[in-house]
A protein has these predicted regions:
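Acidic side chains
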Residues: 1-2, 9, 48, 86, ...
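Amphipathic alpha-helical dimerization/coiled-coil segments
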Residues: 17, 72-98
């Protein structure tokens, strides 16, 4: 799964937001969210596949932490799209002001 597909789901975005607060487990996330531990694990798996989280196994516990590097692709894309729309709006304003 690519970064954009992973971020396309609002629940995954919320899981990622919570993981960004510091390393955590699926069990802890499930206690904080209105979804089951199995659902949290499914979303964490998708985020892991997209490279957005890192899994660290310690005994029986699996902790997840944020990997921010892939988000630079998102920031770059959003910046490009934003510039394109700014230019289009400036062109429209120019035409309307004539």
């Amino acid at each position: 799964m690519d970064v954009f597909a992973a971020l396309g789901d609002p629940t995954r975005r919320e899981v990622l937001r919570r993981v960004a607060g510091g390393p955590t487990t699926a069990t802890r996330l499930a206690l904080e969210m209105p979804i089951s531990r199995q659902a949290v694990s499914k979303h964490l798996s998708a985020l892991d596949e997209a490279g957005l989280v890192e899994r660290t196994v310690s005994g029986r516990e699996v902790r997840y932490s944020l990997r921010a590097e892939p988000l630079s692709d998102v920031v770059g894309w959003v910046t490009e799209v934003g510039k394109a729309w700014d230019q289009r709006l400036a062109n429209l304003k120019s035409r309307l002001d004539r």
